[in-house]
Amino acid sequence: MNRLTLEEFKEAEKLPLIVVLDDVRSLYNVGSVFRSCDAFRVEAVYLCGITATPPNAEIHKTALGGEDSVDWDYFKTTEEAVEKLKQKGYFVYSIEQVEGSTKLQNLPEAHEELFKQEKESEKQGNESEKQESSSLPKGYAVIFGNEVKGVKQNIVDMSDGCLEIPQFGTKHSLNVSVTAGIVVWEFTKLLKL
């Protein structure tokens, strides 16, 4: 296996994706998300509200050191995190089952639509206008909500869009860390490190 050292990981190119945890209460879920983010070299994890932060033995138990390799930041509120992401030029998705959400399997088409809009913008303007009005994001951010309440409605409203994982059984929810692993993998395929 080609495992990176911690130093090599810190220097390696990252997937332009930031994972945001919105009031995730389980320390084991937080650790598991860090572990998945390490596996796919995610740019950073933003921990918000009641979400616990490293160093923490329970987070470490499931993260297996992922909390040391993946950059992270803490925000008192998820609103602050979303505002920062938008200022930095990220396209923000809430992962939530809401009317009008994009099915995760349709993410490539949604991504392609951003590029299509950018190409149309290029045809209509000069170089300086392109830079000012670029519709291409610097990267993506995905927000995962509380295990019981999901992503708060005001955060959904602040987001650029919503993604959901279609489900076909008797339950209409997945564990937040499982959901994060699935979504991060889809972005890994889309953005190709």
Walk through the language-model features, giving the residues of each.
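RNA substrate-binding interface of SAM-dependent RNA methyltransferases
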Residues: N2-G100, T188
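Glycine-rich, phosphate-binding/catalytic loops in enzymes
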Residues: S36-D38, A110-H111, M158-G161
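Short, glycine/polar-rich helix-capping loops at beta-to-alpha or helix-loop-helix junctions
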Residues: P54-I59, K149-I155
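A structural motif corresponding to the C-terminal end of an alpha-helix
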Residues: A81, L85-K88, V151-G161
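Short Gly/Pro-enriched loop/turn and capping motifs at secondary-structure junctions
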Residues: V98-G100, E147-G150, F168-T170
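Intrinsically disordered, low-complexity terminal tails and inter-domain linkers enriched
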Residues: Q105-K138
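Structured adenosyl-cofactor binding patch, chiefly the S-adenosyl-L-methionine
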Residues: Q153-L193
